Amino acid sequence: AIGGNKLKKFPTILFKTNSQVSALGLNGNGIEEIPKGTFSASKYSYMMKTFDLTYNHLSKLPDDFNGKNMPFLYGVDVSNNRFTEVPTGPMDAATLTVYAVRSQRDENGNRLLRKWPSNISLCPSLRQFCIGGNDLRKITDTISSYIIVFEIKDNPNISLNLSNVCNMIKAGAYLLIYDPEQDIRGCDYVK
């Protein structure tokens, strides 16, 4: 882990030199960009399993930050950055199990992320999705029953229907982390 070192640039040297890295903790650095081609250029990027990119200044991930280059991705945390949309590249990794995109804010603390990712249902291995602390609005997608930990708290304008996972919530097989005042429909059990 090389977090908290005030790195402004992503350490591409790790991938240019074909380092065999499977977990990378770069939290709390202030990184603003990951250069395009970082992951497609390395013959060992396929070994990557876990990224902690929290508390940086990222607003996008390069196109090569995806399941094709990193097919064994297990967990990605990009919380506390500056994304206006959920980065979808990691979601095409067949093994992505944990994905966190909490609290996306600009430099003044304004919430940036309002759009629900349209391809979340195409990620069947995803079991934990944390998207709290944003400004999500009406979600019309059916919430995946594969996700068993779903964190949406601190989204004051959210509106969603959980009827398809309500029985799982009642049975204790689905952990919903939410605020009681949120507009959650289709499952009276959560009120």
Model-derived features with residue positions:
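Canonical leucine-rich repeat
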Residues: 10, 34-37, 61, 86, ...
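Conserved hydrophobic position(s) of the canonical leucine-rich repeat
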Residues: 7, 21, 31, 48, ...
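Leucine-rich solenoid repeat scaffolds
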Residues: 76, 129, 137-191
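Consensus "Asn ladder" position of solenoid repeat domains
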Residues: 2-5, 26-29, 53-56, 81, ...
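Conserved hydrophobic beta-strand positions in leucine-rich repeat
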Residues: 1-2, 22-26, 48-53, 73-78, ...
